[in-house]
């Protein structure tokens, strides 16, 4: 059975696979982050969100996997076999857990739409030949800001609020102001 754990969240395993394996922090760092930011919600008997539920499940799976790894470490006599199991867990299962934890923590922190937009942006960036792409990859925490800049105000700062001098405003607000001043006098 081929189950995609990201499907109900609008993402796919393939979308996350564009991010290199060294992109994801260690499981320990991700667990510490989840605990620091969401401990109360994760330990609560109440349902908070599907991301909290998925995060709980990933944390529980990692705990069970560590229990199994400890058992294997204590019961496998052959050091070569033990190393094979440990390497497999760290390389394959560890990466999947790191991806899951990162995805759900990021969705809770930045919002699902921002994370999905980031994954698509990074996927486009990484598949673009180096000669034709910007030197730096998109950054998740600044994505909404840079997306607005690229789409609407190419070359301008994102905070610019004053209209350009060529644009003229409708005369009606000025008339209203002048009429109200006259009535106050």
Curated annotation (Swiss-Prot):
- Variant or mutagenesis effect after changing residue 97 to L: Frequent mutation in chronic HBV carriers
| Main subcellular location | virion
Q: Where are the sequence repeats?
A: 157-163, 164-171, 172-179
Q: MF terms per GO, please?
A: DNA binding; RNA binding; structural molecule activity
Keywords, alphabetical: Capsid protein, Cytoplasmic inwards viral transport, DNA-binding, Host cytoplasm, Host-virus interaction, Microtubular inwards viral transport, Phosphoprotein, Repeat, RNA-binding, T=4 icosahedral capsid protein, Viral penetration into host nucleus, Virion, Virus entry into host cell
What's the reported outcome of changing residue 48 to A?
No effect on dimer or capsid formation
Q: Which organism is it from?
A: Hepatitis B virus genotype A2 subtype adw2 (strain Rutter 1979)
Please list where the region (Disordered) is annotated: 136-185
Does the entry feature the keyword Phosphoprotein, yes or no?
yes
Give residue numbers for the modification (Phosphoserine). 157, 164, 172
Q: Which domain of life is it from?
A: Viruses
A single GO cellular-component term from the record reads: T=4 icosahedral viral capsid
Task: Answer yes or no on keyword Phosphoprotein.
Answer: yes
Q: What is the name attached to this protein's record?
A: Capsid protein
The entry's function note states:
Self assembles to form an icosahedral capsid. Most capsids appear to be large particles with an icosahedral symmetry of T=4 and consist of 240 copies of capsid protein, though a fraction forms smaller T=3 particles consisting of 180 capsid proteins. Entering capsids are transported along microtubules to the nucleus. Phosphorylation of the capsid is thought to induce exposure of nuclear localization signal in the C-terminal portion of the capsid protein that allows binding to the nuclear pore complex via the importin (karyopherin-) alpha and beta.
Phylogenetic placement of the source organism: Viruses, Riboviria, Pararnavirae, Artverviricota, Revtraviricetes
Chain intervals for the UniProt region annotation (RNA binding): 179-185
Complex formation: Homodimerizes, then multimerizes. Interacts with cytosol exposed regions of viral L glycoprotein present in the reticulum-to-Golgi compartment. Interacts with human FLNB. Phosphorylated form interacts with host importin alpha; this interaction depends on the exposure of the NLS, which itself depends upon genome maturation and/or phosphorylation of the capsid protein. Interacts with host NUP153.
Which family does the UniProt entry place this protein in?
Belongs to the orthohepadnavirus core antigen family.
Q: Where is this motif: Bipartite nuclear localization signal?
A: 160-177
User: What gene, per UniProt, encodes this protein?
Assistant: C
| Positions with biased composition (Basic residues) | 149-178
